[in-house]
Amino acid sequence: MQRFLCLVACSVVLLVLGIVADDEIGQVPEGGWTRGNKSNGERCKFNQHCHSKCCVLSERGKPRVCASKALEGESCNAGQIKGGYHARFCPCALGNGKCIKNICQLL
C-alpha cells in the first residue's frame, strides 16, 4: 500500500511539473497570463495579450502578432486554435458581420 501511495504522489508531482513547464499547451485562464496591453504588430502568445483581443499566426515559423479584428468585406477566420490564438486572420469585429467563407459579411 505504501508503494502505491508513493507511486501516486510521484505521478502527481511529475504531472504538475510537466504542466507548469509547457505554457503552449492547455487552457488559458480567463484574462490570459498578462493583461491585453499589446498593440497591433507586437508579439503575443494568446488573444488575451492583445488590446484588440486577436493574436494571429500568419505563417509557420514566424512569431504570432496582435492584429485588428476584420471589418466588413475583409478576410476573417472564425475559428480559434487551442491555446487561444488565430491562424492567418482575426474574426469579424462586433457589428461587422459574420465570417462566411473567410470574408466578413453582413446578414
Curated annotation (Swiss-Prot):
GO MF: enzyme activator activity; toxin activity
Chief localization: secreted
Keyword Secreted: yes
Tissue specificity annotation: Expressed by the venom gland.
Keywords annotated in UniProt: Disulfide bond, Secreted, Signal, Toxin
InterPro entries in alphabetical order: Colipase (IPR001981)
Modification note: Contains 5 disulfide bonds.
UniProt keyword annotation of Disulfide bond present: yes
GO BP annotation list: digestion; lipid catabolic process
Family designation: Belongs to the scoloptoxin-18 family.
Protein name as catalogued: U-scoloptoxin(18)-Er1a
Organism in which the protein naturally occurs: Ethmostigmus rubripes (Giant centipede)
